[in-house]
Structure formats: C-alpha cells, structure tokens
C-alpha cells in the first residue's frame, strides 16, 4: 500500500509540474504583428485603462476603433492591425 501511495504522489507532482510548464510556455507566446500588449500599451485617450480584460469586448476601450484585431489574451488586450491612415485626428 505504501508503494502505491508513493507512486501516486510522484505522478501527481509530475502532472502539476507539467501543467505549470505548459502555462508558462503559453504566457511566453506572442501573436505576430502585435503593436502592444496590455500594460505596454500607452493610453490613447484619458479614460483608457491599460488593457486589462476578461473578454474580447472589454478591449473596445483599450484599442483604437480602427484596430481591426482587438482580442483579450491572458487578461490583456491585444491591439494590432491598426491602420494609421484611418486614425482620427487629434483634437
């Protein structure tokens, strides 16, 4: 019985370590053609928060509306494919 408990403990630790390494690997990935992510994004207007989100629709206030790609990834807004040609003029 002691051998099976030890084996189960080793398997459990291995599973936890693999989950942690997979999670870290996902956080290191970055989509291509991304101009800025989350806290790296400078505010574009006074009410902008620095990209925290829970779903894609939360990024509407963090990305300029002319950014075609506005996604929530690991609770950070990703704004990309922004064409400066259609950027609003500063007031």
From Swiss-Prot:
Keyword Ribonucleoprotein present in the record's keywords: the answer is no
Q: Does the keyword Signal apply?
A: yes
The entry's cellular-component GO terms read: extracellular region
A biological process (GO) of this protein is: defense response to fungus
Q: Which UniProt keywords apply?
A: Antimicrobial, Disulfide bond, Fungicide, Plant defense, Secreted, Signal
Q: Where in the cell is it found?
A: Secreted
Signal peptide span: 1-25
Query: Which protein family is named in the record?
Result: Belongs to the DEFL family.
Please report the name of this protein according to its UniProt entry. Answer: Defensin-like protein 269
